[in-house]
Amino acid sequence: MIKWIIILLIVAAAASLLGMPALAGAAATGARILIGIVLVIFLLVVLGIFAVT
């Protein structure tokens, strides 16, 4: 999932540099959503609620 976050951030940066604000915003929003999901899963693992084996 971290791989997708990095890809989306690179796409957002490239689109922004090329003058495509809609694509940049969509990619940044996707990355932001994935970052939120990763943080929630991380907190659940740290608190021991969600065990990864």
UniProtKB/Swiss-Prot annotation:
Keywords: Cell membrane, Membrane, Transmembrane, Transmembrane helix
Signal sequence extent: none
Domain of life: Bacteria
Gene Ontology, cellular component aspect: plasma membrane
Subcellular location(s) of the protein: Cell membrane
Predominant place of localization: membrane
Chain segments annotated as transmembrane: 4-24, 33-53
Family matches, as InterPro entries: DUF1328
Lipid bilayer topology: Multi-pass membrane protein
Coiled coil: none
Family, as annotated: Belongs to the UPF0391 family.
The protein, known as: UPF0391 membrane protein msr4317
UniProt source species: Mesorhizobium japonicum (strain LMG 29417 / CECT 9101 / MAFF 303099)
